[in-house]
């Protein structure tokens, strides 16, 4: 949807943490943002090697994308997390404790969107 905002994080899991252990914590974190009315959806993606490409990208295996209807909702969600209150504090800690240091984040806005690509 044009005008939507997507907050993405690229990261790797800590040593000894498996995907099956991690995914429920990220899902719970993302679903909380939907339940309280900030976000409209999410995607959790695993990076696949593409021979000959991606050499200039930072090292990451996963990308989590939290989808907002607009930048105002994304910014409100960011402020909500900064308040460090419950339950988002515990949900964030449960998820973040399984991720290696060095995760990186960015926000995008959709300028042209095709419904079939959602």
Which residue ranges define each predicted feature?
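Short, flexible turn/loop "capping" segments at secondary-structure junctions
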Residues: 1-5, 55-58
């Amino acid at each position: 949807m044009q005008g939507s905002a997507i907050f993405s994080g690229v990261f790797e899991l800590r040593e000894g943490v498996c995907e099956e252990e991690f995914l429920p914590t990220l899902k719970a974190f993302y679903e909380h943002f939907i339940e309280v009315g900030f976000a409209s959806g999410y995607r959790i993606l695993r990076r696949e090697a593409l021979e000959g490409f991606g050499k200039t990208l930072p090292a990451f295996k996963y990308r989590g994308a939290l989808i907002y209807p607009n930048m105002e909702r994304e910014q409100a969600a960011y402020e909500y997390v900064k308040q460090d209150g419950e339950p988002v504090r515990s949900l964030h800690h449960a998820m973040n404790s399984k991720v290696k240091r060095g995760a990186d984040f960015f926000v995008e806005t959709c300028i042209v969107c095709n419904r079939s690509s959602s």
